[in-house]
Amino acid sequence: MRIGLFDSGIGGFTVLKKVIELCPNNSFIYLADTARLPYGVKTNNEIKKIAEEISSWFRYQNIDAFLVACNTTNAIALDVIKNNLDIPVFDLIGSAASNIQESRVGVLATPSTVRTKAYTNAILEFKPKTFVIEQPCPAFVPMIEMDNINSDDITDVATGYLQPLLKQKIHSLILGCSHYPLITSSLRKVLPSSVKLIDPAEALSFKLKFFIDSKTRNYSKNKNFVDLKFYVTSNLKNFSNKAKHWLDVFPEVNLVSLQKKGWVS
């Protein structure tokens, strides 16, 4: 199958890695809208416009399923994407919310995601008595995209973001931005070992696997086969280097303009 997914930058790598682990032997098309990152401080209208452009581009990529690997877009413009695509769309927020077991849940997310209370609303839909507290983290994505991941600086920032959640004695912490699993080690320095970390990509990956298995039961079992194609809207060389580092692949990366109809495909 051909699976499409996108993010503003490298955050979606965390989703891609989880999906490849569970769903090898498929083709993946990854679009990084690097020209407009970070999404987490944009307005709802800006995010909806971006979602319209990205989903329109993917309509021409002959994909069988689409993964919203960006929580901010998921929170604000999931309906835009679903209305623009006539294929199954898998989202991070709904996938994570449906699997929550704990009664006190913290969420780290971008300011735009927190503003929508998308995680709170989704969790309460499945488990109405859950206590949920969301914390905006505007500094994380820029620091991660600049490879400032294992430094004391990001640990200090994480400490400030986590204190309000720890005061509420949370049992689990949702990483509500696909960039955040890249700083798990820094978060663990601050969090008590009793707090469970939840990566929404895990639940999404299982949902995708169930879908693929139900549609394709005779595919190759060679787990070494993965077909990857990458597209970016800017900073091609920088993105390529990051893909080599985080995914251990030497990808062909193409530059694409989402505002023009002369799309690369």
Swiss-Prot record:
Source taxon at top rank: Bacteria
Reply yes or no: does the keyword Lipoprotein apply. no
Q: Which residues bind substrate?
A: D7, S8, Y39, G40, N71, T72
**Gene Ontology annotations of biological process type:** cell wall organization; peptidoglycan biosynthetic process; regulation of cell shape
Question: What EC number(s) does its UniProt record assign?
Answer: 5.1.1.3
Q: Which UniProt keywords apply?
A: Cell shape, Cell wall biogenesis/degradation, Isomerase, Peptidoglycan synthesis
Residues in coiled coil: none
Which GO-annotated molecular functions does the record name?
glutamate racemase activity
Query: SUPFAM superfamilies, alphabetically?
Result: Aspartate/glutamate racemase
Pathway noted in the entry: Cell wall biogenesis; peptidoglycan biosynthesis
Q: What class of enzyme is it?
A: isomerase
Instruction: Give one Pfam family.
Output: Asp_Glu_race
> Which family is annotated?
Belongs to the aspartate/glutamate racemases family.
Q: Any idea what job this protein has?
A: Provides the (R)-glutamate required for cell wall biosynthesis.
By what name is this protein known? Glutamate racemase
Q: Which gene encodes it?
A: murI
